[in-house]
Amino acid sequence: MTRLVLGSASAGRLKVLRQAGIDPLVAASGVDEDLVTAGLGSDTSPRDVVSTLARAKATQVAAALSHAVADDCVVISCDSQLSIDGRLYGKPQSVANARQQWQSMAGRAGQLYTGHCVIRLLNNETTYSVDETSMTTICFGNPSAEDLEAYLACGESLQVAGGFTLDGLGGWFIDAVYGDPSTVVGIGLPLTRSLLSRAGLSIAAMWAANPVI
């Protein structure tokens, strides 16, 4: 029975998988995202940035798994970044940064890139790995100053790419989404299904081995 390991501490990604019938093992990577990004060239594309980060996370998680889990499992890690006018926006980390991001985003459209990396382990060996990036266009609304400050004060925006959520309070300020909504939350179900299939794993098998109880 192949266990699915979510290499992420993201509550949003965990929620997406559980709502889709899979209760994964959770193992946060601890990768220093700033350090990895600093090692990339300034001309690195958004797709390559998130793909590199997703692979770094998945690789670290896979290497730290117990022998019992690594005997038969698949690791998936993701990374998301919002791009507006070629500038990437990650997690704001502070209210001041989140406010600045929203001032740049309000009333505009941005592209959310989410890198996905899947590593298949069998008998404690990597038998397959693949990474790919999905992109979704998001049209942001124009929250009033009062609404924006209330949203920033709740803290939700600080630890999510772009400083917003679709499935939380930030959903009030998203006017439209063009593409896969689950990608906006942090893990794209269509792309994940495709990557698992390439690793020889069906969604039916994942449901059976990782049931939500």
UniProtKB/Swiss-Prot annotation:
Keywords: Cytoplasm, Hydrolase, Nucleotide metabolism. It is found in: Cytoplasm. The keyword Hydrolase applies. This is Nucleoside triphosphate pyrophosphatase. GO terms for cellular component: cytoplasm. CDD domains: Maf. One of its GO terms (molecular function) is nucleoside triphosphate diphosphatase activity. It catalyses: a ribonucleoside 5'-triphosphate + H2O = a ribonucleoside 5'-phosphate + diphosphate + H(+); a 2'-deoxyribonucleoside 5'-triphosphate + H2O = a 2'-deoxyribonucleoside 5'-phosphate + diphosphate + H(+). It comes from Mycobacterium leprae (strain TN).
